[in-house]
Curated annotation (Swiss-Prot):
One of its GO terms (cellular component) is plasma membrane. Belongs to the MscL family. The chain crosses the membrane at residues 35-55, 97-117. GO terms for molecular function: mechanosensitive monoatomic ion channel activity. The keyword Transmembrane helix applies. This is Large-conductance mechanosensitive channel. Channel that opens in response to stretch forces in the membrane lipid bilayer. May participate in the regulation of osmotic pressure changes within the cell. It comes from Rhodopseudomonas palustris (strain ATCC BAA-98 / CGA009). The keyword Transport applies.
Length: 159
């Protein structure tokens, strides 16, 4: 095989591989997944804002102005700071207030997804219940069914 044949062989293989990849990438499932990931990322930002800008301030107002994001426990005696950012600079800290906020984010996302999926399942169930009943058999189908049933019973025509 000379170099020209080798180049042609690799071009054909590459073209076939590129076509297979294009077919895979253009399948509905891959495109749907990409859209889902993009929407999910945007939804994550909305939930983060909901928790940080709406829910946590309400909880903070109820609890007398507590800001959970700065709650931490120092794991070293050298940590003397009052804010989480400063405490992290001074040494090891257990940032449990931040963990609480992230946990609330998760619970809200899970609750919203549960509500959406539950609603979709109810709509799907209602759609299945409202489907029209199967069509009544035609006269020809009824006669064929009767003939079949008679043949099964062995009551065919007498000679």
């Amino acid at each position: 095989m000379n170099s020209t044949d080798s180049v042609r062989h690799f071009e054909q293989k590459g073209s076939k591989l590129l076509k297979e990849f294009r077919d895979f990438a253009m399948k509905g499932n891959v495109v749907d997944l990409a859209v889902g990931v993009i929407i999910g990322a945007a939804f994550g930002g909305i939930v983060t804002s909901l928790v940080g800008d709406v829910i946590m301030p309400i909880i903070s107002a109820i609890t007398g102005g507590l800001d959970f994001s700065n709650y931490f426990t120092a794991l070293s005696k050298s940590v003397t700071a009052n804010t989480l950012a400063e405490a992290k600079k001074q040494g090891a800290v257990l940032a449990w207030g931040n963990f609480l906020t992230v946990t609330l984010n998760f619970l809200i996302i899970a609750a919203v997804l549960f509500a959406v999926i539950r609603s979709l399942n109810k709509l799907k169930q209602q759609a299945e219940e409202t489907k029209s009943p199967p069509p009544t058999p035609t006269r020809q189908e009824e006669l064929l069914t009767e003939i079949r049933d008679l043949l099964k019973k062995g009551a065919g025509p007498s000679p």
